[in-house]
Amino acid sequence: MFTARKASVEDCGLIREMACVAFPDTYKTILSPEQLDYMMERLYSPENLRRQLAEGHVYYIAYKDGTPCGYLSVQPEADDLYILQKIYILPRFQGVHAGSFLFRKAIEHIKQLHPAPCRMELHVNRHNKAVKFYERMGMRKLREGDFEIGGGFYMNDYIMGLEI
């Protein structure tokens, strides 16, 4: 059985611990080791996680039978637009519907904040197998782009969206 709870600053260590497994596993065949290191520091250093929470990112941690199995982050972008910043599942929990559980949790969170119709968007690397997952969850490709992230690196992403 899956459960989820909203994360607090005290959970930054747990989020980072899961990210150190899930993020490299997701991108090991897509990004260079140098870009992986750069992005891990940029996204998951303790100070950057605390900053994200202070800026309004809301993290949820998912559990399967009491064991942490993944996390998500949602951020309001505009009155009727929310960004699914992150959704990652530890490799050993992939294929057991943890991702769809967290995806639905993101929608539930947004609907609590914004009962009127709105849109959820996300960026996903064009070569990430998660593109198919997001399509199965009802998202569609809105546009694509190559976004400079510093350090000479780019994110080569689809921007996908879902009306909720």
Regions found by a protein language model. Name each.
Residues 1-3:
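Extreme N-terminal starter segment of soluble prokaryotic enzymes
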Residues 6-12, 17-92, 103-113, 141-147, ...:
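Acetyl-CoA-dependent GNAT
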Residues 67, 90-104, 117, 125-132, ...:
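Conserved glycine-rich acetyl-CoA-binding loop
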Residues 116-131, 135-164:
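C-terminal "cap" of GNAT-fold acetyltransferases
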